[in-house]
């Protein structure tokens, strides 16, 4: 996706600035006198300089003048006008460009009075990497830097893994990393269980492997029917030729393809590529449900809970969601909506400009597409009901946390810290965040710990180093609106708490922010339910075994532990799969393969004598010396 940057210019006329004493509607009226009748974006600022609202207009002068009129505003708009102390404006060439800029600014600035998309994150894709002679099938998230074909988005990693599993069975394309691929001297377990064709050890010729890759690509592009017919024809031919082994392999591949094309929770008949977006609102809260259909298949769904005030209408929420959701994602050719929105045509033009292809927004009234929308709307309604029930329960738990730790207010942000390592190796710290909405996974963070950070086999020093980095950054970013925790919970006992308090006092973090810092220590023999809690300057205490707050704090501690362990395992796995030959300049895939074929492993190459290295085909005397010297260092 190529992002289009609007050609715009800021209005920067000092003579147009209103008098410092003006505020609210009078201030806005003073701005209106100098505004042009052109499209653009406006920002409203409060007394503390924070952005209150970002809006766009086809005609800035007309749109902003509405705020100067003191009548007919909702309570939310009236409050916003009253708080306004400054405005800024950007003129754009078209209203479409204004809409794109507005969506971008709302996502980056998160103004108080705008409808905000929360829980936004990059979605996983399937990538067929083609920057290697044997293409690799893998999952991908983030920037598209690798050369290859991307397919998605998928609603979750689970949906990606399920599809990858099917693709392995049906097309036998490798999923291993390049370093593992280059290090193979015999086929791996995936080949033995018929999930890979074994290109790493030449069990399939390159042309035949490329054909498998092409078939996998066709499948992901929605050409599954033609592909299945071709495989069925080839299976019949193999049977007639009495080649029953080949026929059985083709049969298994056909079954794998059939499994993914028939196992759909929602019937996507007639919809090759579309997102179905539905909103349900109740009690001043909303859920937006999105189903992703690609290649005629349902690739999963996701729930979102935008932040907005009580007065927001469902169509208003839906329009704001669409603009922000596709701000950094490629939109499909068709977006089906549950509600009519006023600016559907303008949104379509903006998304077409950003995606560089035609994008249409449509609210179906009847037929198969309406059935898809209704099913999506049902999911939105059920998800919001669950969310509201969980929120009520969560509030009671947070009241308990407030009581246990003697907090002034109901905690809005709790940060929990843990670290993980094995005898100091692959050391890693982790922070998880919880609040009124439950676990806030888009705020989770991991901290790579190295020797210059702390003694990585010393839990106290690691915790101290991790919190020093976190608190230092917090002090720098606090004035820019960075979230400040109400409670910091450390997985550990009195020693860990003392180490962290040293850093907090050194940086003045408790005096500056009023953060409460506590520790949770496992009970004797690590028994759950016998945890002790520590607060600075107070004796340790325990909670009753059946106290719901105890269970909640255990869940927080366990989630931090899970997140830390997961990061440590990923780090350890990467270290184990990294090939030491990759670091030697001049050693490419062919030389690496020759060395591994000759010696059997990278460890044997490391221990090889210079004369043995010189005896390998394709390794010159100079290269042998280079390899030998590399490992000697």
Swiss-Prot record:
Pfam family, one: UvrC_RNaseH
Domain UVR: 225-260
Subcellular localization: Cytoplasm
CDD domains: GIY-YIG_UvrC_Cho
GO cellular component: cytoplasm; excinuclease repair complex
Start and end residues of each GIY-YIG domain: 37-115
GO terms, molecular function: DNA binding; excinuclease ABC activity
Keywords carried by this UniProt record: Cytoplasm, DNA damage, DNA excision, DNA repair, Excision nuclease, SOS response
GO biological process assignments: nucleotide-excision repair; SOS response
Protein family: Belongs to the UvrC family.
Subunit structure: Interacts with UvrB in an incision complex.
HAMAP family (alphabetical): UvrC (MF_00203)
Chain's role: The UvrABC repair system catalyzes the recognition and processing of DNA lesions. UvrC both incises the 5' and 3' sides of the lesion. The N-terminal half is responsible for the 3' incision and the C-terminal half is responsible for the 5' incision.
Protein name: UvrABC system protein C
């Amino acid at each position: 996706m190529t992002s289009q940057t609007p050609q715009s210019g800021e209005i920067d006329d000092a003579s147009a600035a209103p008098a410092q004493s003006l505020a609210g509607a009078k201030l806005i009226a003073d701005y209106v006198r100098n505004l042009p009748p052109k499209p653009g974006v406006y920002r409203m600022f409060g007394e503390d300089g924070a952005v209150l609202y970002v809006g766009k207009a086809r005609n800035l002068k007309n749109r902003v003048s509405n705020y100067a009129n003191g009548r007919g505003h909702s309570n939310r708009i009236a409050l916003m006008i009253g708080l306004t102390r400054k405005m800024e404006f950007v003129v754009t060439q078209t209203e479409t460009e204004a809409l794109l800029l507005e969506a971008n600014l709302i996502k980056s600035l998160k103004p108080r009075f705008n409808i905000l998309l929360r829980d936004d994150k990059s979605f996983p894709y399937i990538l067929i990497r083609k920057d290697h002679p044997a293409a690799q099938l893998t999952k991908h998230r983030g920037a598209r830097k690798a050369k290859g074909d991307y397919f998605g988005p998928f609603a979750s990693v689970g949906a990606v893994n399920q599809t990858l599993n099917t693709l392995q069975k049906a097309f036998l394309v490798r999923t291993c990393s390049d370093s593992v691929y280059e290090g193979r001297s015999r086929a791996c377990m995936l080949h033995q269980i018929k999930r890979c064709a074994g290109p790493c050890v030449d069990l399939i010729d390159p042309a035949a492997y490329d054909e498998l890759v092409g078939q996998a690509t066709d499948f992901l592009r929605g050409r599954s029917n033609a592909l299945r017919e071709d495989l069925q024809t080839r299976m019949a031919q193999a049977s007639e030729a009495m080649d029953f082994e080949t026929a059985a392999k083709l049969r298994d591949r056909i079954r794998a393809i059939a499994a993914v094309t028939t196992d759909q929770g929602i019937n996507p008949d007639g919809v090759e590529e579309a997102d179905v977006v539905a909103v349900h609102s109740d009690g001043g809260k909303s859920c937006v449900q999105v189903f992703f259909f690609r290649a005629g298949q349902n690739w999963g769904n996701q729930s979102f809970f935008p932040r907005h005030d009580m007065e927001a209408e469902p169509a208003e929420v839906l329009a704001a969601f669409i603009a922000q959701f596709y701000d950094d994602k490629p939109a499909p050719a068709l977006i089906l909506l549950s509600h009519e929105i006023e600016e559907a045509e303008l949104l379509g033009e903006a998304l077409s400009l950003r995606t560089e292809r035609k994008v249409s927004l449509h609210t179906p009234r009847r037929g198969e597409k309406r059935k898809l929308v209704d099913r999506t709307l049902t999911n939105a309604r059920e998800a919001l009901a669950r969310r509201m029930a969980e929120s009520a329960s969560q509030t009671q738990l947070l009241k308990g946390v407030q009581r246990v730790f003697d907090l002034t207010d109901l905690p809005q942000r709790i940060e929990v810290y843990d670290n993980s390592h094995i005898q100091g190796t692959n050391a890693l710290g982790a922070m998880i965040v919880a609040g009124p909405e439950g676990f806030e996974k888009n705020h989770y963070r991991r901290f790579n710990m190295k020797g210059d950070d702390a003694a990585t086999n010393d839990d106290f020093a690691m915790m101290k180093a991790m919190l020093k980095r976190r608190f230092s950054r917090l002090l720098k970013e606090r004035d820019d609106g960075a979230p400040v925790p109400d409670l910091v919970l450390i997985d550990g006992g009195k020693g860990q708490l003392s180490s962290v308090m040293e850093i907090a006092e050194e940086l003045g973090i408790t005096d500056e922010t009023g953060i409460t810092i506590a520790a949770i220590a496992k009970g004797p023999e690590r028994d759950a339910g016998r945890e002790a809690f520590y607060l600075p300057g107070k004796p340790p205490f325990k909670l009753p075994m059946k106290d719901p707050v105890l269970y909640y704090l255990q869940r927080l501690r366990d989630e931090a532990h899970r997140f830390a362990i997961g990061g440590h395992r990923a780090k350890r796995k990467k270290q184990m799969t990294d090939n030491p030959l990759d670091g030697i300049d001049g050693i490419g895939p062919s030389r690496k393969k020759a060395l591994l074929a000759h010696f059997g492993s990278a460890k044997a190459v490391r221990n090889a004598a210079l004369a043995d290295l010189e005896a390998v085909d394709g390794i010159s005397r100079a290269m042998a010396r280079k390899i030998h010297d590399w490992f000697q260092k």
